[in-house]
């Protein structure tokens, strides 16, 4: 699917009146632009109907082309929001921040926006954290360390943990996405960031691949104060997102956060007018916010400090209010994007990676996804049947069956194990053969999955110890259950085995 965007519009607020000596030149440019636009309209009127979008992109007013300014990544800084308490992803977030949750066998969610920044050549990156951030901090330090990890030139990656300072406002933790950014606005008055013209606000729990500089360039081309990345969605998912309506130039005219019933119906759009294929436009009649924004630096400072000093959230407060007074533009992203903030969406997105032609592809040689180098040996497979699965490095698979599953690093599957529709996150360490033999001799359960165990529709968190002859199948189709003392939860019918859990021999779940 190709990324779509639309024509530019001018800023909502009138620009400063130019000096008298410049007005004639401005008027001439406007006349040239008007003449060029009229010529473009004539060309479009005569063009074949099927070529409407292509011709519209090809015919650019001469004045606009002359005024176009290429944006360099050195003028952009990004802020990756480390997320809140992660209640929707619990129990995976019981001891870790959302961006630190493993994904795809050997990655973490934070690697997605970090890699998108690197591939977009944006090298000034802040990561804001608050809850359970220890493992996230460690992963960022190991992976994106300027001296030892991915190179950043004159850039940096800095983790900004929530802190309390003097004064009444400094005694609060982050109250939302906008409040988190507000508490660190002073950074953008630092001398080393004096060239930063636009600030990219990113989320740490999405799965997608995006060229952020294309997003920023469209933002500048349209003279936008704020730009919001958005995706087309159908009615079944629309109420889970902030929805927007735009005029013909892409300027946001209405924004509702997670509307229901009649309010939801009022947000329908004819998505075909934005260049989507008919089969997509017929089913996806809503434009949903991705929670990804570009702000002009001065506008961000003005809004969070002056205009909306008590607004805590970008999606539900800042963007809807700013759309009334500022030029807030929509950037339609027509590629794969998934908000994996719930157990169900997280599980389904991971299993979808095993498809023969997955919507998201970790193996792109041009725009790779980076992660921590672990220096592990190749996986060892002995007489196994593995179908449509991803097996990470450093694993031991012995006489087992794996079907449509994701196997994380250092995983161990013993003879007779059957895994289907399962995400196994792996382990943080190896046990020696002597340690395993000693534990088995004492009737204990070593790390990994024991002999003749059958597992279906399950997420197995790190370092889990699952014994012999265990059955994890949720045969009674229980949708929700909490058994922390027994080492598991059930969320949306999916069994989640806890990190470091011990499931004894013969257990049936």
UniProtKB/Swiss-Prot annotation:
GO BP, sorted A to Z: glycogen biosynthetic process; starch biosynthetic process
Coiled-coil stretches: none
Record keyword DNA damage present: no
Catalyzed chemical reaction(s): alpha-D-glucose 1-phosphate + ATP + H(+) = ADP-alpha-D-glucose + diphosphate
Pathway: Glycan biosynthesis; starch biosynthesis
Compartment annotation: Plastid, Chloroplast
Activation and inhibition: Activated by 3'phosphoglycerate, inhibited by orthophosphate. Allosteric regulation.
PANTHER family: GLUCOSE-1-PHOSPHATE ADENYLYLTRANSFERASE LARGE SUBUNIT 4, CHLOROPLASTIC_AMYLOPLASTIC, GLUCOSE-1-PHOSPHATE ADENYLYLTRANSFERASE-RELATED
Family: Belongs to the bacterial/plant glucose-1-phosphate adenylyltransferase family.
Biological role stated in the UniProt entry: Involved in synthesis of starch. Catalyzes the synthesis of ADP-glucose, a molecule that serves as an activated glycosyl donor for alpha-1,4-glucan synthesis. Essential for starch synthesis in leaf chloroplasts.
Quaternary data: Heterotetramer composed of two small and two large subunits.
Name of the protein this chain belongs to: Glucose-1-phosphate adenylyltransferase large subunit 4, chloroplastic/amyloplastic
Gene source species: Oryza sativa subsp. japonica (Rice)
Gene name of the record: AGPL4
């Amino acid at each position: 699917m190709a990324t779509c965007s639309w024509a530019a519009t001018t800023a909502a607020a009138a620009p400063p009146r130019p000096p008298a000596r410049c007005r004639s030149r401005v008027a001439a440019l406007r006349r040239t632009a008007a003449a060029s636009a009229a010529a473009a309209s004539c060309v479009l009127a005569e063009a074949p109907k099927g070529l409407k979008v292509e011709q519209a992109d090809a015919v650019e007013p001469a004045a606009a082309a002359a005024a176009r300014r290429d944006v360099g990544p050195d003028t952009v800084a990004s802020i990756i929001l480390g997320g809140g308490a992660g209640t929707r992803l619990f129990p995976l977030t019981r001891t870790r921040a959302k961006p630190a949750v493993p994904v795809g066998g050997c990655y973490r969610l934070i690697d997605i926006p970090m890699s998108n920044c690197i591939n977009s050549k944006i090298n000034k990156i802040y990561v804001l954290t608050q809850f359970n951030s220890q493992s996230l901090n460690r992963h960022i330090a190991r992976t994106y360390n300027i001296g030892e990890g991915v190179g950043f030139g004159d850039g940096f990656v800095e983790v900004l943990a929530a802190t309390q300072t003097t004064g009444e406002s400094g005694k609060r933790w982050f109250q939302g996405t906008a409040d988190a950014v507000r508490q660190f606005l002073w950074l953008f008055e630092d001398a080393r960031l004096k060239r930063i013209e636009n600030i990219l606000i990113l989320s740490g729990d999405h799965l997608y691949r995006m060229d952020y500089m294309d997003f920023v360039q469209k933002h500048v081309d349209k003279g936008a104060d704020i730009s919001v990345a958005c995706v087309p969605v159908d009615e079944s998912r629309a109420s889970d997102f902030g929805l927007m309506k735009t005029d013909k130039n892409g300027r946001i005219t209405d924004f509702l956060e997670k509307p229901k019933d009649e309010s939801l119906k009022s947000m329908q759009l004819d998505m075909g007018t934005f260049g989507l294929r008919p089969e997509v436009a017929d089913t996806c009649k809503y434009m949903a916010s991705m929670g990804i924004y570009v702000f002009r630096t001065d506008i961000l400072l003005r809004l969070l400090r002056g205009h909306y000093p008590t607004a805590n959230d970008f999606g539900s407060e800042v963007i809807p209010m700013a759309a009334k007074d500022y030029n807030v533009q929509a950037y339609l992203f027509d590629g794969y994007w998934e908000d994996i903030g719930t157990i169900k969406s997280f599980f389904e997105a991971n299993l979808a990676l095993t498809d023969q032609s997955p919507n998201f592809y970790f193996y792109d040689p041009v725009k790779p996804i980076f992660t921590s180098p672990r220096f592990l040996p190749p996986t060892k497979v002995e007489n196994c049947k593995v179908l449509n699965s991803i097996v990470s490095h450093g694993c031991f698979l012995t006489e087992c069956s794996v079907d449509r599953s994701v196997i994380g690093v250092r995983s161990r599957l013993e003879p007779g194990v059957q895994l289907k529709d399962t995400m196994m996150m792996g382990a943080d360490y190896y046990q020696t053969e002597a340690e395993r033999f000693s534990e088995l001799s004492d009737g204990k359960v070593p790390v990994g999955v024991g002999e003749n165990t059958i597992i279906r529709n399950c997420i197995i968190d790190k370092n889990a110890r699952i014994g012999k002859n265990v059955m994890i199948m949720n045969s009674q189709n229980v949708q929700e259950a909490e058994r922390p003392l027994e080492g598991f939860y059930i969320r949306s019918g999916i069994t989640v085995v806890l990190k470091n859990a011990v499931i004894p021999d013969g257990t049936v779940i």
